[in-house]
């Protein structure tokens, strides 16, 4: 019961039906760009005479267009990737596979980042020593985005023995491991961009994002064919 609270603090937007009269709210409302799906929320805030403090509007010097001071950053990616490893280990265990990721606790259980890094690097030593069976490998972590969240998630990923490969190399990875041209005792990372997600209808590559954004009907999706079938874990770092 938050009826006695004068300030209600959240992270993501609060459902419109939860907004109370004459309250102060602090959260990401996703309304500053006039996102149509969230206009009912803004209308409700006005109707109920509530006051909204939006993290997105907290900027350097309090000026429009100045750098934001509150945003999802590197540590969101770090914590998310640690929990990703832990959840992945539990998923493999549920599928009947003993695996080194089971030895990674969730992010909140570490005293500090150094402890998390040491734990994950020790798991990496197990991977280097034992590798993965044919049933499990290759393990491919596919990343989207290039911002702070992705940078944080990649930092944690790189605590393990790893190699980055291209989307094209994905298609031959199993064969390359089988013939010894690529190792089986690492995890693989793939960095994907908008160019990997769509192509022109004639099959030619998308090379101009602005043209794609302006003319989406001239393009077809390719990510589901070229990337997803070869991906073990999709690490989504863009909004």
State where each predicted segment sits.
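Glycine- and other small-residue-rich loops at beta-strand/loop junctions that grip anionic moieties
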Residues: 30, 69, 73, 142, ...
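Rossmann-fold NAD(P) dinucleotide-binding segment
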Residues: 4-33, 221-233, 239
């Amino acid at each position: 019961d938050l009826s006695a609270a004068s300030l209600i603090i959240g992270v993501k937007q609060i459902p419109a039906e939860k907004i109370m009269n004459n309250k102060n709210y602090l959260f990401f409302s996703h309304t500053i760009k006039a996102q149509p799906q969230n206009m009912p929320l803004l209308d409700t805030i006005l109707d109920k005479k509530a006051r909204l403090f939006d993290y997105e509007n907290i900027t350097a010097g309090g000026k429009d267009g100045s750098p934001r001071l509150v945003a999802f950053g590197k540590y969101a990616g770090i914590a998310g990737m640690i929990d990703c490893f832990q959840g992945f280990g539990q998923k493999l265990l549920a599928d009947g596979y003993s695996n080194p990721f089971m030895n990674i606790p969730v992010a909140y259980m570490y005293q500090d980042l150094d402890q998390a890094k040491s734990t994950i690097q020790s798991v990496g030593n197990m991977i280097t020593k034992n590798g993965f069976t044919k049933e499990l490998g290759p393990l491919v972590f596919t990343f989207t985005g290039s911002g702070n969240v992705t940078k944080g998630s990649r930092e944690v990923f790189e605590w393990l023995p790893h190699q980055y490969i291209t989307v094209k190399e994905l298609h031959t990875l199993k064969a390359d491991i089988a013939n010894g041209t690529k190792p089986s005792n690492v995890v693989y990372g793939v960095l994907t961009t908008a160019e990997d997600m769509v192509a022109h209808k004639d099959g030619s590559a998308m090379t101009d994002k602005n043209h794609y954004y302006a003319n989406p009907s001239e393009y077809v999706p390719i990510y589901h064919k070229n990337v997803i079938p070869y991906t073990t874990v999709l690490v989504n770092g863009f909004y």
